[in-house]
A protein has these predicted regions:
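Hydrophobic core segments of alpha-helical transmembrane domains in multi-pass membrane transport
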Residues: 6, 13, 44, 49, ...
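Ordered, amphipathic secondary-structure segments that act as subunit-interaction surfaces
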Residues: 60-103
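C-terminal ends of transmembrane helices
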Residues: 22-36, 84-98, 150-161
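Generic transmembrane alpha-helix signature in multi-pass membrane proteins
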Residues: 21-29, 88-93, 105-106, 113-126
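Helix-coil boundary and interhelical linker segments in multi-pass alpha-helical membrane proteins
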Residues: 1-5, 57-70, 120-133, 187-190
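Structural signature of hydrophobic alpha-helical transmembrane segments
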Residues: 3-18, 66-82, 134-146
Length: 190
């Protein structure tokens, strides 16, 4: 598979949030400020890239040879949980302000279905280790793009007058829907 097409497809065409609808909880919960969204995007890029690499290696070199591939979901969850703990400890020591801003959403990366979904999708699509890493990294980049763009739009919306009935969740969901339609326009490009 062409690596460039895989990267563009993972980040834009098959965007993990706006096309596959995985990772909606942090997308809606952390996208209030661009700085927080960028921090969450960075954490997800790190975790999803490393998780894709580690889960692919474990799948190809441990689970398949031992005929234990039916355990991939459980093993992948454990790997992702360990990686998130590492990121949490790292952020707490090095960037405490970002750690505080992410709050409860940082541990929720463990249960972020986007991270687990991409790891499982890599296996399901039969990607090799290199392709899994590229797919994981650029799916995470797509996640970061979507959450940062949404945060920027939400900051602009908060500064404007909108009808009372649209304030809060309604305008956020309408905005997310319009973003999904915009990304859907890229569907025929690859």
């Amino acid at each position: 598979m062409n690596i460039i097409l895989l990267a563009i497809s993972a980040a834009l065409v098959n965007n993990v949030i706006l096309s596959q609808f995985m990772g909606i909880c942090p997308f809606l919960g952390v996208s209030k400020k661009v700085s927080t969204a960028a921090g969450m995007g960075g954490a997800v890029i790190f975790v999803m890239t490393i998780a894709s690499a580690v889960t692919s290696v474990i799948y190809h070199f441990v689970l398949v040879p031992l005929k234990l591939s039916y355990l991939n979901t459980i093993v992948f969850i454990l790997v992702i949980a360990a990686l998130v703990q590492f990121v949490e400890m790292f952020l707490k020591k090095t960037i405490p302000s970002l750690y505080e801003a992410l709050g409860v959403y940082l541990p929720l990366i463990t249960t972020n279905c986007a991270v687990l979904g991409i790891a499982l999708k890599n296996v399901q699509d039969g990607l090799n280790i290199g392709e899994s890493i590229i797919n994981g990294m650029f799916s995470a980049v797509g996640f970061a793009i979507a959450i940062i763009v949404m945060a920027g739009i939400r900051e602009k919306i908060d500064k404007n007058d909108i009808p009372e009935s649209f304030k809060g969740a309604p305008i956020v969901l309408i905005t997310a829907g319009l973003m999904a339609i915009a990304f859907l326009g890229l569907n025929g490009s690859i």
